[in-house]
Amino acid sequence: MKHLCSLLCFLLLALPALSKERTIKPGQIWPDAAGNHINAHGGGVLFHKGYYYWYGEHKAEKTSSALVGVTCYRSKDLVNWTYCGVALQVEDQVGSDIEKGCTLERPKVIYCPRTGKFVMWFHLELKGHGYAAARAAVAVADKPTGPFLYLRSGRVNPYCWPADWSEADRACADTLQTAHFGQWWTEPWRKAVAQGLFVKRDFNGGQMARDMTLYVDDDGRAYHIFSSEENLTLQVAELSDDFTYHTGRYWRIAPGGQNEAPAIFKHEGRYWLITSGCTGWDPNEARLFTSKSLLGPWEQLPSPCVGPNAKLTFGGQSTFILPVQGKPGAFIFMADIWRPKHPIDARYIWLPITFKDNVPVVEWRDEWVPEEVFE
């Protein structure tokens, strides 16, 4: 009887391990350890001391406004995730930048070894102002799970021209006025956008910052990459040594190209950037850019997506490229399938990135096992 009881106890203890999932199923419900669909949209992943931490927007049933904040999940294997709580809570205080009901999107977290702090940046729109604010916001924490302390928000790099502009470039942009263009999308208007029409317009107040990601380069320098200039141009802005301020140095990617949802990684000395076009919540074809320097110049290549519905990025939109720890050259493409009428039911697309002729390929798989793909 004693042996039988011991065996039963062993089996009960072993059940959680036996029930662990091994596969990622893109586009399907993804339960956490408690059986609840993971609620971390537009997010990114940080690896720290043996764990992956997944941060994302908490979505409600009927609104995309932030009613909770930024959630955090933790995993060792990229498949089984445990809910760690709300890492950054929106506030009840009326008039707060992050008042409940604001728009809080695409949170990303990086670790700053100089300060020992975890630093979160996100796109913020003030409650009741639609998408007019176009702010970048920052918060810090002592632990990866938070709580994160909100610091500030605002436009980016006021009174600063792009770092690679010549005096002639600055002089040209300084003559541009939005009032001179009564109609958008004309050839003269497009030329003016490329020359810095909106850079000049927002010179005093700072550059617009919407869809965004963060990237820490091999030398430890951190960068904030975001959609700016009325979502017409991406900007790459250098962060301070503590990762909580912009230094005033920034560069532009694909001026006038209408790119958002940036996701970046580096492989064998070359930077790769996946973006989307600007079609609201609706999916469109992914775009691929590459450069030997984070600061450019960037070259656009065909979409990296292959398989059913590849022309619409499998129904999703890029959010982050996840480097697999301990596996050089192994990356996961992360995207969201948005469902604006039922935001909480939005789904995730996670797919391994392969390389063909040294160019990234994101091929659809109904399901896949990370430990097999990245063995």
Q: What are these regions, as identified by a protein language model?
A:
Residues 1-10:
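Sec-dependent signal peptide recognition
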Residues 10-18:
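Hydrophobic h-region of N-terminal signal peptides that target proteins for export
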Residues 18-375:
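Carbohydrate-active catalytic/glycan-binding domains of CAZyme proteins
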